[in-house]
């Protein structure tokens, strides 16, 4: 199976999400699947660096957590890449930009999309706006 993992967080960023995705990728590849990571650019990765089966999309720092990134384009490029690698399924790992792009790709290619919900946002509320909602 050709599997596309869509995430706003991937190595070299260090997080539980990035580690979870790498673990999933490795396990799926051990079972004979082809796994493709669709993720954000990272300032620690030189432009033009070749990362097998990793596709990076233009991104900027996320507003509240500047060590995290959010893609600001990539719908058409991701769809083109997904067609080229003949994705069978999309697995989104974020509710943000790359998650939306992944859902768009699945819809365009008429393939299934599944989602993993990693973050309990209510547990992070105290980090954003000192715990106050707008």
Residue ranges and their predicted role:
Residues 93-98, 117:
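Short His-centered aromatic/hydrophobic patch
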Residues 63-89, 98-104, 108:
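An amphipathic, basic-hydrophobic alpha-helix
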Residues 1-58, 82-83:
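N-terminal subdomain of nucleotide-sugar transferases
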Residues 112-114, 122-134:
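Nucleotide-sugar donor phosphate/pyrophosphate-binding loop at the beta->alpha transition
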Residues 33, 87, 111:
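Short glycine/serine/threonine/alanine-rich loop segments
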Residues 8, 117-120:
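Histidine-centered beta-alpha loop that forms part of the nucleotide-sugar donor binding/catalytic region
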Residues 52-57, 108-110, 131-134:
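Short, hinge-like loop/turn segments at secondary-structure boundaries
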């Amino acid at each position: 199976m050709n599997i596309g993992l869509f995430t706003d967080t991937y190595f070299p960023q260090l997080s539980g999400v990035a580690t979870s995705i790498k673990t999933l990728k490795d396990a799926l590849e051990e079972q004979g699947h082809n796994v493709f990571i669709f993720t954000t650019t990272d300032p620690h990765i030189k432009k033009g660096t070749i990362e097998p089966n990793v596709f990076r999309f233009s991104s900027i720092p996320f507003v509240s957590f500047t060590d995290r990134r959010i893609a600001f384009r990539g719908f058409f490029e991701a769809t083109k890449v997904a067609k080229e690698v003949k994705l069978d399924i999309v697995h989104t790992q974020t509710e943000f930009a790359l998650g939306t792009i992944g859902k768009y790709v699945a819809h365009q290619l008429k393939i299934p999309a599944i989602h993993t919900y990693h973050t309990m946002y209510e547990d992070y509320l105290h980090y954003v706006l000192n715990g106050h909602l707008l």
